[in-house]
Curated annotation (Swiss-Prot):
Keywords: NAD, Oxidoreductase. Catalyzes the NAD(H)-dependent interconversion of D-fructose and D-mannitol in the mannitol metabolic pathway. Belongs to the mannitol dehydrogenase family. It comes from Neosartorya fischeri (strain ATCC 1020 / DSM 3700 / CBS 544.65 / FGSC A1164 / JCM 1740 / NRRL 181 / WB 181) (Aspergillus fischerianus). Monomer. This is Mannitol 2-dehydrogenase.
Length: 502
């Protein structure tokens, strides 16, 4: 039987052909459900995480009030709009592990709005009484958060554009849309929707609140006060490794499962979500599908810290040095015994001592789980994905561990090696002289600083929005990172790495 195009009409045939290896949604969609969630930034991670939890609630528990309306704010989001529209907003989740592959057609995304085509439609959707939650996966750079001052980058041209009252009906940024939608709800006497960040940031909810309230105060203090008093911004820790979809993934889906999907998602079996129980206008029963909903924000912060420092920090330790050394995939880097030992020792000796104990969580078991996940060859997790937008990642995943280690006079030389590798990475040339693309919103500034500084880290460290002032004045840190930068420049990653392994 020839592969079938994914759409509502073909679902039953797809299920029959796939047998036990393919699951399809059997719940009602379209006008039969309410779209209680508006999600900004429908990419791979959202479609492997929040959308899957909502799919499970709709499939297993009959939830009908929290279907998702996806929103794309950027011009490049037209590709997602077109892919989803061509298949009735269905898509395939491909779960891969050593045990095999499984396909799950997800139906929780009920519609999609492309803001550049109709910005008013997005604002109206946020203001609709059915909308209870606006969720976000907009990456670190989408928050306009200054890592040094912890304030909104209010001078950014996009923020300035959205602060102009003349542009209120045609905002550019997430905060411009959130403000416009909430202002309309305020005027209509509706409760504010919960703003639920699903991005990899510690205190993601608190940061989102502060950024939006700061934006609103610059526009309308009365609306800002209402948001501060009535709004909800739960903190959350999210986790699921989700590589970029390749053409090979699409081909394998058609060959193995008989499904033709314009944009499937590949992911691992592991998934985790810990979220603070802080919602302003109701929420789905997340607990029924394995989400850890906690009352104590401190508990969320502890989970966040574990995940960001261990998983994301280790990803950075594989990504930037691995790219410089010529590797393509995470599992390839982990197959190298030097890298495997380096990452384990960094986790155990430099990061673990800085982490809080969480009742019921064994850090050593967690580290072992991470090693197992990183070595999964079936998901083909690309290093360029790990390395994307590093200016929003390194200040969260690596530098705080260095700063804390300095404070308690602990070891941090391996962490410095990772930072030094990133400083070389921003130049866009690997150890063999082969150029690669650096994708980062701060690329021009980073590369200018890297060229000016050479093997001296001081120029890059002068970017206060990323590094502040404290590290530049610490002699231990400057000595370690300068040594690492010089060694990498002279000998390359693979010859330098053994110096950082005991």
């Amino acid at each position: 039987m020839a592969p079938l195009k994914l759409n509502s009409k073909n679902l039953s045939q797809i299920a029959a052909a796939g047998g036990a290896l393919v699951k399809i949604p059997t719940y009602q969609r379209g006008r039969a459900v309410k779209e209680g969630i508006v999600h900004i930034g429908v990419g791979g991670f959202h479609r492997a995480h929040l959308a899957v939890y909502i799919d499970q609630l709709m499939q297993k528990h009959g939830v009908t009030d929290y279907a998702i309306c996806g929103v794309g704010l950027q011009p490049f989001d037209s590709a997602m709009r077109d892919a989803l529209a061509s298949q009735d907003h269905l898509y395939t989740l491909i779960e891969r592990s050593a045990k095999g592959s499984f396909a799950h057609v997800i139906g929780s995304i009920n519609s999609y709005l492309f803001a550049p085509d109709n910005r008013e439609a997005v604002i109206a959707k946020m203001a609709h009484p059915d909308t209870k939650i606006v969720s976000l996966t907009i990456t670190e750079s989408g928050y306009y958060y200054n890592e040094n001052t912890h304030e909104l980058q209010s001078e950014h041209p996009d923020i300035q554009f959205d602060l102009d009252p003349a542009n209120e009906k045609a905002p550019r940024t997430t905060f411009g849309f959130l403000y416009a939608g909430l202002t309309r709800r305020y005027q209509q006497g509706l409760k504010p929707f919960t703003v639920m960040s699903c991005d990899n940031m510690q205190k993601n909810g608190s940061i989102t609140r502060h950024m939006l309230e700061s934006f609103a105060r610059l526009r309308n203090p009365e609306v800002a006060e209402w948001i501060a008093e009535e709004g909800a911004f739960p903190n959350a820790m999210v986790d699921r490794i989700t590589p970029q979809t390749s053409e090979n993934d699409k081909t394998a889906l058609a060959d193995t499962f008989g499904i033709v999907d314009s944009w499937p998602v590949v992911t691992e079996p592991f998934t985790q979500w810990v979220i603070e129980d802080q919602f302003s206008n109701g929420r789905p029963p997340f607990e029924k599908v394995g989400v850890q909903v906690v009352k104590d924000v401190h508990a969320v912060e502890q989970f966040e810290k574990h995940k960001l420092r261990l998983l994301n920090g280790s990803h950075s330790a594989l990504g930037y040095p691995g790219q410089l050394a010529g590797f393509k995939y995470v599992h390839e880097v982990m197959e190298n015994p030097l890298f495997r030992k380096f990452v384990w020792q960094m986790m155990q000796e430099e990061v673990k001592p800085l982490l809080p104990e969480i009742p019921g969580v064994n850090i050593d078991e967690y580290c072992n789980t991470l090693i197992e996940r990183f070595t999964n060859p079936t998901i083909m997790d690309q290093l360029p994905r790990i390395c994307l937008n590093a200016s929003g990642k390194i200040p969260q995943f690596i530098m705080p561990s260095i700063a804390e280690a300095i404070w308690v006079t602990g070891p941090f030389r391996r962490l410095c090696f990772v930072a030094a590798a990133w400083f070389h990475y921003v130049k866009g040339v690997d150890d063999s002289g082969k150029p690669f693309e650096v994708v980062d919103p701060m690329r021009e500034e980073l590369q200018a600083k890297a060229r000016a500084g050479g093997n001296d880290p001081f120029e890059l460290l002068s970017i206060k929005s990323l590094f502040g002032d404290d590290l530049r004045s610490d002699e231990r840190f400057l000595k370690e990172i300068t040594t690492a930068m010089n060694d990498i420049a002279r000998d390359g990653i693979m010859k330098t790495l053994p110096k950082y392994i005991d």
